[in-house]
């Protein structure tokens, strides 16, 4: 099974939150880009300070999504399935309101997946039962 198949299976699992720890978040983001080309799912990427954009349309930022609170309000209000890749979201996870909003998204009626992507993720305890966790710790030999 290749990486794209594994990634697709993770997204199809019954978890609304996925945490992915990796030494190479850029490579994983590239895998999401590749996966989006062969999928009917809508994929979005959020980066701190840059906001949210749909993969394949990075030049079009989604308004009012730069701040984590506004981003999660946007994700919660989406009426369609989407995969939302949040890069380096640890600072926001320290805020109790952020955790509550993620729990609300995880329990929502509209199926969507929030992917927390970073080299290390300090996952708050209340989110652990709702989160599929993945750690990729191999470094490339050089």
What is each stretch, according to the model?
Residues 1-142:
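ATP/nucleotide-binding catalytic cores
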């Amino acid at each position: 099974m290749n990486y794209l198949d594994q990634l697709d299976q993770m997204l199809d699992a019954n978890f609304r939150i996925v945490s992915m720890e990796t030494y190479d978040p850029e490579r994983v983001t590239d895998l999401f880009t590749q996966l989006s080309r062969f999928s009917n799912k809508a994929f979005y990427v959020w980066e701190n300070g840059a906001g949210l954009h749909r993969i394949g349309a990075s030049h079009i930022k989604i308004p009012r999504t730069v701040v984590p609170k506004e981003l999660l309000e946007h994700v919660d209000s989406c009426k369609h399935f989407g995969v939302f890749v949040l890069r380096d979201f640890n600072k926001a996870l320290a805020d109790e309101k952020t955790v509550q909003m993620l729990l609300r998204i995880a329990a929502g009626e509209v199926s969507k997946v929030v992917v927390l992507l970073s080299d290390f993720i300090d996952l708050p305890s209340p989110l652990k039962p709702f989160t599929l966790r993945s750690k990729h710790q191999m470094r490339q030999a050089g």
